[in-house]
Amino acid sequence: MFKLHPQKKKTQTRNYTGPWRKTPGRLLGLLLIRFYQITLSSFIGNQCRHAPTCSEYIYEAIARHGLWAGAWMGLFRIMRCGPFGTHGFDPVPTSLGNSYYFYKPWCYWKISARHNK
């Protein structure tokens, strides 16, 4: 009479689960970040001063904005994560706007201060 449908088990992940285009560059970047999260991160330990952690931030930045912009955003995030750097909630921006060009990667440094105000 009643059919019980097995409920799908939600996968637990700490990484970005929203929609993103699966291009070769993004897949390569995300594969490298995931490799780091599974292997090296457990040896180093969680010492990030931000939420989301730096590896989660880079994963989401690459998924949302591509390998080039996401990698630069991630590099600058790691540079901000030192003992004299910033701390607290620092999300990846949903859009970069019109002032960010691939040939000016140093502009990605300003993203955090600009979108968190």
UniProtKB/Swiss-Prot annotation:
GO terms for cellular component: plasma membrane. Could be involved in insertion of integral membrane proteins into the membrane. It is found in: Cell inner membrane. HAMAP family: UPF0161_YidD. It is a peripheral membrane protein. Belongs to the UPF0161 family. It comes from Bartonella quintana (strain Toulouse) (Rochalimaea quintana). PANTHER family: MEMBRANE PROTEIN INSERTION EFFICIENCY FACTOR-RELATED. It comes from the Bacteria. Its main location: membrane. Keywords: Cell inner membrane, Cell membrane, Membrane. This is Putative membrane protein insertion efficiency factor.
